[in-house]
Amino acid sequence: MRAEVLQIRWHYDANDDHTPIYSVDFQKNSLNKFATCGGDSKIRIWQLITSESSTKVEYLSTLSRHTQAVNVVRFNPEGNILATAGDEGTIMLWVPTNTPITTLADDAEELALAKEYWKVKIVCRSMGSEIYDLCWSVDSNFLIAGAMDNSLRLYDAHTGQLLTQKFDHSHYVQGVCWDPLNQYIVSESSDRSICLYEIQEEKKNPKKFQLVLKSRICRIEYNVTKFELISVTKPLNNDESSGISEPIETSNNNESPVSKHEALSSTANIVKDGSLERTEPPNSLNSKISYSLYCNETLVSFFRRPAFSPDGLLLVTPAGRLRPHGQPNFEVPYTAYIYTRGSITKQPVACLNGFKKPVIAVRFSPIHYELNSFSNFSFTSVSFNLPYRMVFAVACQDAVYIYDTQTCKPFYRAVNLHYSNLTDIAWNDDGNVLLMTSIDGFCSVITFEPGELGVKSQHKISLPEKRSASPSSIDDSQDNTAGGPATTTLIPRKVESSKVSKKRIAPTPVYP
């Protein structure tokens, strides 16, 4: 493994100063071609050239139609369309062209150096609210977008038409992802929750479907003993803490600590990280305590980018906070939660701990590998039973950790590459290159030697067949604008999922 910062002029303003880079994505079916975007309202296309001793970047093109900062770039699964969106609230779909199309925002010098050209084919317009994240459907027919007006919007990628919108979050939607099995859509918000929508087909018209809110996950519930009830309901003295410790990293504490005057009582419902909510009186034998799963809006990050695994069996969500059960005075560490397909509507089955700063993004490698024979402990014996390994990267604000679905600890970690917070990560097609972007205006790259991550598995992952789409593919007659789940009863899609043999009471901590 080799990690290095690529020190070139990525994105810059009129004063020639570096501007933040907010997103990166590799083009599918290409030779390490990727796109970046940032605070200069530009999108740039690059070619990554790797060798045994160094990594070089070649400039290819600049896309200049946006008028404000661009927050996300995403290539479609085929790699022939690039979707971009940002603060102006408009999604633009770009396609390659043989002739340059100039605009007033184009730079003559960059245009002369360009080696390829792109043009806007489709424009998806919204109500003008800033868009933080995008994701394509597996068949490239649709796009979902999370926005600053607390909305999740779905567009037809062929026409740009807004098909449906959901307002089930109470704060900014900072991350979205589409299930590879085409059954679910997930959004994550700074309201400390994730929303899971099911794509349900109509019985009479299989080409027509709608999004139905199946679950909104924001807290985890524990059964407590009488002793535990006394410990967490004890009144606070002037010299006692609230039972919620500040993180060890006090130099960059992004969460507001609970005031010592906020005593925990039988009716307490403190909306803070690691907060407690009682569901029964203290003397009840059935008393339960629930804890918030995710960071609140004080987290200093524009993005919370979740990800499905390529086979659709796992979902990993960032921006988690874990409160160990029975330890009210324990510090609340940052974490990323893992959901299996069987638990996706309920609660996480495991969590990845040990991060000094919040997790902001997760990305799975497109390659799956043969199982290692030397692993002494694996997720397989705890939660999963997969005939292959999948590799995924977890990006914190200050570091990147690389895991696989077989081992319980990260096997690579990259730290101290940037002065400012990370914003996005992306894998290339062969899974040997991981790019990361930062607010400091630079990109860094982690390069793996062929075979370093393992032997590629010959096991085939079956995904739904692609289908043709039309502007009427989504039924928007049941749009939920009031914040509750749709009440229309539809016949759900039949998608095979793993059965849960027992109910999990709490996530299983996995410490690096």
From Swiss-Prot:
Q: Which Gene3D superfamilies match?
A: YVTN repeat-like/Quinoprotein amine dehydrogenase
Modification sites for Phosphoserine: S468, S470, S473
Cite the GO molecular-function annotations of the record. H3-H4 histone complex chaperone activity
Known role: Acts as a component of the histone chaperone complex chromatin assembly factor 1 (CAF-1), which assembles histone octamers onto DNA during replication and repair. CAF-1 performs the first step of the nucleosome assembly process, bringing newly synthesized histones H3 and H4 to replicating DNA; histones H2A/H2B can bind to this chromatin precursor subsequent to DNA replication to complete the histone octamer. Plays a role in the maintenance of heterochromatin.
Q: Where is this region: Disordered?
A: 239-261, 459-512
rRNA processing listed as a keyword: no
Query: Which keywords appear in this protein's UniProt record, sorted alphabetically?
Result: Chaperone, Chromatin regulator, Cytoplasm, DNA damage, DNA repair, DNA replication, Nucleus, Phosphoprotein, Repeat, WD repeat
Which family does the entry's similarity section mention?
Answer: Belongs to the WD repeat HIR1 family.
Species for this entry = Schizosaccharomyces pombe (strain 972 / ATCC 24843)
PROSITE patterns linked to this entry: WD_REPEATS_2, WD_REPEATS_REGION
How it assembles, according to the record, is:
Component of chromatin assembly factor 1 (CAF-1), composed of pcf1, pcf2 and pcf3. Interacts with pcn1/PCNA during S-phase. Interacts with swi6 at the G1/S-phase transition and early S-phase, but not in the G2 phase. The CAF-1 complex interacts with histone H3-H4 dimers.
What's this protein's name?
Chromatin assembly factor 1 subunit B
Q: Which Pfam families match?
A: Beta-prop_CAF1B_HIR1
Q: Which gene specifies this protein's sequence?
A: pcf2
Protein location = Cytoplasm; Nucleus
